[in-house]
């Protein structure tokens, strides 16, 4: 899936898919194994779930244009963190008899006209 960097007509959904693809590629290049994408629960959606050695990583992806009023990091509200945590608990209860060690990361993508910058924040919850 390839999108032009400055396509202002791209839908929010397509932009989100593009951000998740960039994040998945970035995490894979840094040694993580993506095990699930777009996992839904009654609390919300988990963008990516990855394996980092023996740690299961729940990943929130945020993509923002450089001109946006709110940065990618600022767009992750306490309410969003709470929903991510609840969604992760729901996922673990449904998929594991004994939950593995887990952490919550965020991949922040700032989109410029000609390029993008990716920042990976580990352990963003608790």
UniProtKB/Swiss-Prot annotation:
InterPro entries: Restrct_endonuc-II-like, tRNA_endonuc-like_dom_sf, UPF0102_YraN-like. It comes from the Bacteria. CDD domains: PoNe_Nuclease (cd20736). GO terms for molecular function: nucleic acid binding. Belongs to the UPF0102 family. NCBIfam families: PRK12497.1-3, YraN family protein. This is UPF0102 protein DNO_0639.
